[in-house]
Regions:
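Blade-loop segments of beta-propeller domains
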Residues: 46-53, 57, 79, 84-112, ...
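Glycine-rich, histidine-containing beta strand-loop boundary motifs that form or position
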Residues: 72-73, 89, 118, 159
Length: 168
């Protein structure tokens, strides 16, 4: 069974939508943990040779109803909600379903899909229950820094203006 590469044609619509982030800059307020949570639970993660986590990138932990997904730039670890190691998702390399580095993940519990934004201009898609690579989605701009899947084919992205010259 061969992996599939999916390329989507842009759809004419009212997109892109510009969100005025500058309006929120400088508007800070202190929030107590008790304002947003009733309790705190510590979950010790299983440690063995397959799941030695060297570091966790900021904002790179995702919890679903059944799993925790913990990521560094080079590995995505899957754990049960009680901390038992399940598997690593994907692997480093240049083949189908592989990556050199990845920036972020998103998970759709309803469809059981894991979406991984790689640094090579694509989003790898894996099956949550098996870790199997299914297909990848090419993204038009390699400068994409963050993303969210709106459905299985529609992606919202945030692109860095690293040169300071880009207007759109």
């Amino acid at each position: 069974e061969q992996p599939v590469t999916v390329e989507f044609e842009p759809v004419e619509s009212e997109y892109p939508i510009t969100i005025p982030f500058e309006a929120g800059v400088g508007v800070e307020r202190e929030i107590k943990l008790s304002d947003i949570a009733d309790s705190v639970q510590y979950v010790p993660l299983e440690t063995n040779d397959k799941c030695l986590i060297d570091f966790i990138n900021s904002g790179k932990v995702v919890k679903t109803g059944k799993y925790w997904f913990v990521s560094s730039n080079t590995r995505l670890y899957q754990y049960t909600t009680d901390g038992k190691f399940v598997r690593n998702i994907g692997s480093r390399g240049g083949g189908p379903g592989q990556f050199n580095y990845f920036q972020q993940i998103d998970v759709n519990e309803d469809t059981g899909l894991i979406f991984m934004l790689t640094t090579s201009g694509k989003i790898n898609v894996y099956e949550m229950e098996t870790g199997k690579f299914l297909y990848d989605i090419k993204i038009p701009d390699k400068e994409t820094a963050q993303f969210a899947m709106l459905n299985d084919t529609l992606v919202a992205t945030f692109m860095l203006n690293s040169s300071g010259q880009q207007k759109e």
